[in-house]
UniProtKB/Swiss-Prot annotation:
Coiled coil: none
Organism, scientific name: Escherichia coli (strain K12)
GO biological process, one term: DNA damage response
Family assignment from sequence similarity: To B.subtilis SpoVR.
Highest taxon listed in the record's lineage: Bacteria
Name by which UniProt lists this protein: Uncharacterized protein YcgB
Residues that span the membrane, as ranges: none
InterPro entries named in the record: Spore_V_R, SpoVR-like_C, SpoVR_N
Disulfide pattern: none
């Protein structure tokens, strides 16, 4: 079992402020770094930037990125955040951390030294180590090139605005953003290339793509037999879930610069793909380590009681889970659930009960530090909950499941936190973090190559859930990119196909 001695008291205590200086930040950072190394936290080098509340709101509005291309939606988000913040209806995060190499962490200058220490432990060592080591981030993102790529994207889109007009570029980005969640291949992992390679390939990609589009949309087949075979074959041969990629490669009317912008939005969507699937784990891991590191410093006598009281007050607020019948309830707090599960894994390893040995025979009594790193590296929220959610955590959170069947006019409590309900609760909760259950399953089904060039999308409902009424507006964006008629079908449980929408609509069809 891993044992790390944190009880050697040090009579030299760090200043507890509350005001901070850059020198004091350096001292705290050095101590946090020393403790983090004891727990084998493997991180990227970090770059810490202290910013104002207005700069933090600006970072909020640009989805936390240090630089981004221009679009009205970012300004709208800034104004909304600023209004809520100034009226006291919304607070600001103490930090924002960027999955990059070096890992960029933004600290609010209004923070006390206690909060700055918490943020450095949370972001620079918790999130940072998660970004570097979790399998989804390793497979789907390239931390060393994201900032350079965003600089390239900003420059390219700005040049397009100057050449083709702001309105034209804005309309294209509107459509790309509307389909951003459908810009990732979930099973085909992206190839990692440097910014220099990206630029070198850009010109050749433009020429190649246009030649491929010309080949796809040629109207005069060489031989009659070729025509017959082509008409009998559906295109694409398999349904395609990556709508933006398909548009980039196949939309008949897009120009090369428009295809490049689609590619840029796809790349940004791909960057955020792991984050959507690891919020509980990522925040839980970072919260576990800021709690562990700062308690370690207190046990060593490095920080004061006043420091700890302020820290624990903030930490308790972060991991508070309102009950289901509270007016402040808005779902399960990912900080609370993630922190509780990592704490529980440590407990199961160090002091397993008979219940723990039955539920977790592989990890009960094992090295807690090794087990925690294994859980962090090789799981995402769905599988993490399915594998490690224990009966104790279910009891602590008082979990129960509510079955809402659209075929009945009542709700059913199908499981509670007891022996009969543990497995169902765990399965139901993990399925809530399955991205396939959270986003509509809409795929490109067919293109009428030899007819009117119409595009057919097919929606396969999950648990008979209907599409939102906003589907009409989204279909307009698909039509803008494709350039020809677009149809949206639904495949029902009995296998029948139903036409939901057509853009542009035809009189008498809908």
């Amino acid at each position: 079992m891993a044992t790390i001695d944190s009880m050697n008291k040090d009579t030299t205590r760090l200043s507890d402020g509350p005001d901070w200086t850059f020198d004091l930040l350096d001292v705290y950072l050095a101590e946090i770094d020393r403790v983090a190394k004891l727990y084998r936290l493997d991180t990227y080098p970090h770059q810490i930037e202290v910013i104002t509340s207005e700069q933090m709101m600006d970072a909020y509005s640009s989805v936390g990125m240090p630089i981004n291309y221009p679009h009205w939606s970012f300004g709208k988000k800034f104004i909304e955040t600023e209004r809520l913040y100034k009226h006291g209806q919304q607070g600001l995060a103490y930090e924002i951390v960027i999955n990059s190499n070096p890992c960029i962490a933004y600290l609010m200058e209004e923070n006390t030294i206690t909060m700055q220490a918490l943020v450095m432990a949370h972001a620079c060592y918790g999130h940072n180590s998660f970004f570097k080591n979790n399998y989804l981030f390793r497979s789907w993102t390239d931390a060393s090139s994201i900032v350079d790529y965003l600089i390239f994207a900003r420059k390219y889109i700005t040049e397009c605005e100057e050449r083709y007009g702001v309105d034209e570029v804005e309309r294209l980005l509107d459509s790309c953003h509307a389909l951003m969640n459908y810009g990732v291949d979930r099973y085909k992992r992206p190839q990692k290339i440097s910014l220099q390679e990206e630029k070198a390939r850009q010109k050749s990609r433009e020429e190649y793509l246009q030649s491929q589009v010309n080949m796809l949309w040629r109207t005069l087949p060489k031989r009659e037999e070729e025509k017959t075979v082509a008409e009998a074959r559906r295109y694409p041969s398999e349904p395609q879930e990556n709508l933006l990629y398909f548009m980039e490669k196949n939309a008949p009317l897009l120009e090369s610069w428009q295809r490049e912008i689609l590619r840029i939005v796809r790349k940004v969507s791909q960057y955020f793909y792991p984050q959507k699937q690891t919020q509980v784990m990522n925040e839980g891991w970072a919260t576990f380590w800021h709690y562990t590191i700062l308690n370690h410093l207190y046990d060593e006598g490095k920080v004061t009681e006043r420091f700890m009281l302020e820290f624990l007050h903030s930490h308790t607020n972060v991991v508070f889970q309102p009950p289901y019948n509270s007016p402040w309830y808005s779902g399960i707090n990912p900080y609370a659930l993630g922190f509780a599960m990592f704490q529980d894994i440590k407990r199961i390893c160090q002091s397993p009960t008979e219940e723990d040995k039955y539920w977790f025979p592989d990890i009960a009594g094992s090295d807690w530090l090794e087990t925690l790193h294994f859980a962090m590296r090789d799981f995402k929220d769905e599988s993490f909950i399915s594998q490690f959610l224990s009966p104790k955590v279910m009891r602590d959170f008082r979990f129960f499941t509510v079955l809402d069947d659209d075929r009945h006019n009542y709700l059913e409590i199908s499981a509670i936190h007891n022996e009969e309900g543990y497995r169902e609760i765990r399965n139901r909760l993990s399925s809530q973090y399955n991205l396939s259950n959270l986003e509509p399953n809409i795929q490109i089904w067919n293109v009428d190559l030899r007819g009117d060039r119409s595009l057919t999308l097919r929606y396969i409902p999950h648990n008979r859930a209907p599409l939102d009424r906003g589907r009409k507006e989204v279909l307009k964006h698909v039509h803008r990119l494709w350039g020809f008629d677009v149809m949206l079908e639904q495949q029902n449980e009995d296998g029948s196909i139903e036409l939901l929408e057509r853009c542009p609509p035809r009189m008498g069809n809908l």
